[in-house]
Swiss-Prot record:
Family annotation (InterPro entries): GrpE (IPR000740), GrpE_coiled_coil (IPR013805), GrpE_head (IPR009012)
Alphabetized GO MF terms: adenyl-nucleotide exchange factor activity; protein homodimerization activity; protein-folding chaperone binding; unfolded protein binding
Similarity-based family: Belongs to the GrpE family.
Localisation: Cytoplasm
Name of the molecule in the record: Protein GrpE
């Protein structure tokens, strides 16, 4: 029998298989590297798209906030202008009615009805006067009460001055024409007579 024997076929197959695996391992490594590079490139594209979309979203949000702020400012400005227009219209209308109130006030002070018929007429127009005053009161109109109050140039117009020892300087002695307010807004200044303190006036003349 020869010393060099042919190995069994099974052994040859195993040996050949190990050799095949050893040869194919570099190809697998190269393929894995390419896939990783492609995946990294795709991730970079996704990240870039994400950043771009985030930037666009931020810009759209900023544009929306600016638009909302502009609309709110427009709404407030329009509302304020409408309120001012309504107030000015109301003020103009009421101011036109004030002379009518003045005439009623003068009639009440001067007319002394004589007889039943005159008294009936007097009560009739006094009823109209009351209706008018109540209507003005409901929309916020109120008369000033100037007499006895310190003179206030924002409310009063001094058309007369009178020296007196009974009041300090700058007190409204008489209301010559009634002033009116619409809420806090002056509809018409009161025309008044204002005191001049006699002692202060005498001291000024002496000096």
């Amino acid at each position: 029998m020869s010393e060099h024997q042919t190995p069994p076929e099974e052994d040859l197959t195993v040996a050949n298989g190990d050799s095949a695996e050893a040869v194919s391992e570099p190809d697998v490594t190269v393929a894995s590297g390419q896939e990783a590079a492609e995946l990294a490139a795709q991730l970079a594209l996704v990240a870039a798209d994400r950043d771009r979309l985030k930037t666009e979203l931020d810009e759209q949000n900023s544009a929306y906030l600016r638009l909302a702020a502009d609309f709110e400012n427009f709404r407030r400005r329009t509302l304020k202008e409408r309120e001012e227009l309504e107030l000015q219209s109301k003020r103009t209308t009421i101011t036109e009615l004030l002379p009518v109130i003045d005439n009623f006030d003068r009639a009440r002070a001067q007319i002394k009805p004589q007889g039943e018929e005159a008294e009936a007429i007097h009560k009739s127009y006094q009823g109209l006067y009351k209706q008018l005053v109540d209507c003005l009161k409901r929309i916020g109109v109120s008369p000033m009460r100037a007499e006895g109050q310190p003179f206030d140039p924002s409310l009063h117009d001094a058309v007369l001055r009178e020296e007196t020892t009974e009041h300090p300087d700058g007190i409204v002695l008489e209301e010559l024409q009634r002033g009116y307010l619409l809420g806090d807004l002056v509809l018409r200044h009161a025309l008044v007579k204002v005191s001049i303190a006699a002692e202060e006036n005498s001291a000024a003349v002496t000096e």
